[in-house]
Amino acid sequence: MKTVAVVGSQWGDEGKGKVIDFLATQADVVVRGQGGNNAGHTLVVDGKKFALRLIPSGILNSNTINVIGNGIVFDPKGFFEEIEMLESNGISTKNIKISDRAHIVFPYHKELDGLAEEARGDNKIGTTKKGIGPCYMDKTERSGIRVCDLMDKEIFAKKLKLQVDAKNKLVTGVYGKEAMFDFDEIYNEFIVYAEKMRPYVEDTTVIVYDAIKANKKVLFEGAQGTLLDLDLGTYPFVTSSHPTSGGFAVGAGVGPNMIKDVVGIVKAYTTRVGEGPFVTELFDETGDRIRTQGHEFGTVTGRARRCGWFDAVIVKYAARVNGLTSISFMLLDVLTGFDKIKICTAYKMGDKIVNNFPASLEDLAKCEPVYEELDGWHEDITKVEKFEDLPENAKKYIARIEELIGVNVDLVSVGPNKIGRASCRERV
């Protein structure tokens, strides 16, 4: 491992935390460069779970520097809740670095997130109402407030006043509500955060660049998934950032050639949270069984995830747009006990066979899965430690997916625990 990016290759919730946790133990630097505290990742240490949203996964390793990069939208309140949770469990937080270029999520972003979703009526996009989208809107509009602004009281006061006035006009003029944002209240709250944040704030682009040039091991930690990418995902049912390998480079402030390997995290089946077309979605007992066996409920929201068979069209697309160099195949054990397992190898839209993932959601909604059926397995695989010890039908399933995607599966997750949960092929 030198520089590795870990990217979700479906709609998120693929089990990235397991692989990131595994790789973070070897990393000198772990970087998060996109999203905010809308996407959760769970780490397990000695049977204890730590649900993190902003802080990188290397935090459990005392010698690892954990970078919250310039591409993050930073929620100070959520950040310090995580700090308190970690420190109360005896975990040091001194090795966290926050980019001075990261944009800040304010209370008005969260309120506007909820108002906008409510106004959509039947056309909701499934926002987590964490203020992520509105914060990125301010960033794109070039009116946002960054961490470096918060570090200067006068600059912060000037910019916050403009924003509070603008947001109150938006609330009254567009949503027909009374003005709800108070400058003094927000200013006083965030000035306290500023002083608490100050020891963590640096130009993180220098930290990441210097680490790579010194041949240190750097892990780019992805959140969410490829199909939630603002440009490349199932728009508009996407997030407001770029959870793809190209987005990681921008969000960390380094050139794309500095990321040598891109590991795609792929669930052995397909899940999705929220709205939008889902070609292989199962509405029967099989879908319920996958959901139950896979414990498919959101880390942050608790929402039940929609479940379906493996969609090779999606993952082949993700492999292409991310430049995947390998795949980590997660939650294979969830499929244990099925007599037959299906793989979606293409879509059918009317009389037409579709092999590439459509841009148009209207087209995607018309697509039906073209399935290939394989024999399942009934052996317990949760204690398997070597790839060759997997049941033959499980190995055939993986081999067929490698063939369809064109990328090697180098890591297979076979259970919930850190020890004995993964079987690595010899080439890893």
Residue ranges and their predicted role:
Residues 425-428:
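Positively charged, low-complexity/disordered segments
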Residues 1-423:
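Non-transmembrane, aqueous-exposed alpha-helical and coiled segments at domain scale
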